[in-house]
């Protein structure tokens, strides 16, 4: 796959970022290089290789799933423009 300036401009538009026109050609070359590396990764023979997520065995301690108020509801509600009974008060948005 090869990217040109028009494709870079379209990607920038979709990502809602501004890329100056004079940088689009350079960015297209960089993205083409990255895509080349990704294509090379696709050529690697991984048959028989077990997937791993980490090279360190990790086990997480389990804890009880208990609902709490976090210990400081007053501080949390203090950030709200308006609150009532430890809850944020917001305008009604659905009729």
Curated annotation (Swiss-Prot):
Enzyme Commission number(s): 6.3.5.-
Major enzyme class: ligase
Keyword list, A-Z: ATP-binding, Ligase, Nucleotide-binding, Protein biosynthesis
Reaction(s) the record says it catalyses: L-glutamyl-tRNA(Gln) + L-glutamine + ATP + H2O = L-glutaminyl-tRNA(Gln) + L-glutamate + ADP + phosphate + H(+); L-aspartyl-tRNA(Asn) + L-glutamine + ATP + H2O = L-asparaginyl-tRNA(Asn) + L-glutamate + ADP + phosphate + 2 H(+)
GO biological process: glutaminyl-tRNAGln biosynthesis via transamidation; regulation of translational fidelity; translation
GO molecular function, one term: ATP binding
InterPro entries hit by this protein: Asp/Glu-ADT_sf_sub_c, GatC
Function summary: Allows the formation of correctly charged Asn-tRNA(Asn) or Gln-tRNA(Gln) through the transamidation of misacylated Asp-tRNA(Asn) or Glu-tRNA(Gln) in organisms which lack either or both of asparaginyl-tRNA or glutaminyl-tRNA synthetases. The reaction takes place in the presence of glutamine and ATP through an activated phospho-Asp-tRNA(Asn) or phospho-Glu-tRNA(Gln).
Subunit description: Heterotrimer of A, B and C subunits.
Similarity comment: Belongs to the GatC family.
Identification of the protein by name: Aspartyl/glutamyl-tRNA(Asn/Gln) amidotransferase subunit C
Biological source species: Rhodospirillum centenum (strain ATCC 51521 / SW)
Species classification: Bacteria, Pseudomonadati, Pseudomonadota, Alphaproteobacteria, Rhodospirillales
């Amino acid at each position: 796959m090869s990217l040109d300036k028009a494709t870079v401009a379209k990607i920038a538009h979709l990502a809602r970022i501004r890329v100056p026109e004079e940088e689009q050609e350079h960015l297209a070359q960089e993205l083409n290089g990255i895509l080349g590396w990704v294509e090379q990764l696709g050529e690697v023979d991984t048959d028989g290789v077990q997937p791993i997520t980490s090279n360190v065995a990790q086990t997480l301690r389990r804890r009880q799933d208990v609902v709490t108020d976090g210990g400081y509801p007053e501080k949390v509600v203090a950030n709200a423009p308006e609150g009532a009974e430890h809850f944020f008060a917001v305008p009604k948005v659905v009729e």
